[in-house]
């Protein structure tokens, strides 16, 4: 099997030998934030997704190590099977196939990571590589005129901000478990800033929940004061930062913490940019009456992409859970939600097991916390549309955790 030499992330003066699947895993995980969709040119994102999925499948077959299965992965596989069944009764099979491709990628990422990764050096190389690419993207987005030199290379801001949730948690974990305290703390803070500067409420909420989950993993019930403090900081940010407050409410004048405490602020005051109306319309038309099975995989996406709805020119419903309900019903939502519930619970159990080494604990807390944050963002955005940059990262960390556990058990 082909081998390559890379710098050891634990000692930059040393070199490490990796086999072909390990090198391809590092490359795949490090470059998920690259979109290659230059404006005015051929959109390569869907093609790249298909190619990556084929390569992951090939990697599973050529790697001498076995993929690791868990209740989370099995549940997710059943969910994919249910999506395929949904093609049999959908009026939009073409869009259904595209939806399946997007949901299939996290599954393949979990399986391929659990197969390729057996050493902590490979895990750190992949994670640090992904963080370097994310740092470069921040420079491209925020340094004046630099973005013009790289049009369409990175995913746009919405997807990137959700990707930064995983990188923020990864940096925080390295702060706790490595000697480079100052560097990793600064990077953790840096990855929090874009969603605030861009005023992306979805990513702000996702980052907040990811941090709360991280501290709960680490300190359990002792973390409640810290979790409460993080939540208070989120509330303060909503009301104290003018740009966030202006985007949050239809009329931000007179909106403050005092009004929140007195009950003067209701859901009617929140500016959802039409999301609430879209969700209600979608559920009324495609979910109610077909609660168990929905109306078929890809149906809602086809309706929005073809503008067969009263909310033109909007082309997505901005809620993955509403789309699951409309396309695949309660069965689909239970299977998808159950898989990630098992994932987070498994990560929590692994993190509390003191027999495992630091690398496994680090992987577990990053996977569990970033999964919680990313799942929350799916409530107000179609995160699966950018699955290479978003949902695949918690799943990738989870897959690497399974691979490291397999090495630990073998030893």
PLM segments and residue spans:
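Transmembrane signal-anchor hairpin modules in multi-pass inner-membrane enzymes, especially those
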Residues: 1-85, 91, 95, 115-128, ...
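Membrane-embedded alpha-helical segments of multi-pass membrane proteins
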Residues: 43-60, 100-109, 160-170, 204-212, ...
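Transmembrane alpha-helices of multi-pass inner-membrane enzymes
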Residues: 52-55, 342, 364-411
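Alpha-helical transmembrane segments of multi-pass inner-membrane proteins
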Residues: 53, 108, 121-149, 154-219, ...
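Aromatic-anchored transmembrane helix interface
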Residues: 72-82, 93-116, 134, 138, ...
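Hydrophobic transmembrane alpha-helices and their immediate junctions
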Residues: 132, 328-372
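A membrane-periplasm/extracellular boundary helix in multi-pass inner-membrane enzymes
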Residues: 197, 218-265, 280-288, 297
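Long extracytoplasmic/lumenal interhelical loops at the membrane interface
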Residues: 266-284, 288-328
């Amino acid at each position: 099997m082909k081998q390559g030499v890379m710098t050891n992330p634990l000692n930059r003066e040393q070199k490490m030998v990796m086999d072909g699947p390990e090198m391809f895993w590092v490359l795949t995980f490090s470059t998920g934030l690259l979109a290659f969709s230059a404006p005015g040119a051929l959109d390569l994102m869907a093609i790249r997704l298909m190619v990556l999925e084929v390569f992951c499948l090939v990697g599973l077959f050529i790697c001498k190590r076995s993929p690791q299965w868990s209740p989370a992965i099995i549940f997710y596989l059943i969910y994919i099977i249910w999506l395929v069944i949904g093609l049999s009764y959908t009026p939009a099979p073409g869009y259904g196939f595209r939806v399946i491709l997007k949901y299939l990628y996290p599954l393949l990422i979990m399986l391929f990571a659990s197969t390729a990764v057996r050493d902590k050096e490979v895990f750190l190389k992949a994670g640090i590589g992904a963080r370097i690419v994310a740092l470069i993207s921040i420079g491209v987005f925020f340094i004046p005129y630099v973005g013009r030199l790289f049009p369409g290379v990175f995913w746009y801001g919405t997807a990137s901000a959700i990707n930064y949730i995983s990188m923020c948690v990864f940096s925080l974990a390295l702060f706790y478990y490595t000697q480079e305290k100052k560097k990793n703390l600064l990077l953790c803070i840096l990855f929090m800033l874009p969603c605030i500067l861009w005023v992306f409420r979805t990513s702000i909420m996702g980052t907040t929940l990811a941090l709360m989950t991280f501290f709960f993993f680490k300190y359990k019930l002792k973390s409640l004061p810290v979790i409460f403090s993080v939540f208070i900081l989120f509330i303060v940010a909503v009301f104290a930062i003018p740009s966030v407050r202006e985007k949050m409410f239809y009329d931000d004048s007179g909106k403050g913490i005092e009004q929140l405490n007195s009950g003067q602020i209701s859901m009617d005051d929140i500016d959802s940019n039409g999301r609430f109306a879209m969700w209600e319309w979608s559920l009324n038309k495609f979910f109610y009456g077909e609660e168990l099975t929905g109306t078929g995989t890809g149906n809602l996406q086809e309706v929005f992409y073809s503008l067969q709805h009263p909310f033109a020119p909007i082309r997505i419903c901005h809620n993955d859970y509403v789309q699951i309900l409309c396309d695949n019903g309660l069965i689909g939502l239970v299977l998808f939600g159950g898989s990630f519930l098992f994932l987070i619970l498994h990560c929590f159990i692994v993190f509390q097991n003191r027999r495992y080494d630091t690398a496994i604990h680090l992987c577990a807390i990053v996977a569990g916390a970033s999964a919680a944050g990313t799942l929350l963002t799916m409530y107000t955005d179609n995160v699966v549309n950018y699955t290479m940059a978003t949902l695949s990262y918690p799943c990738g960390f989870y897959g690497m955790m399974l691979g490291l556990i397999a090495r630990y058990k073998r030893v």
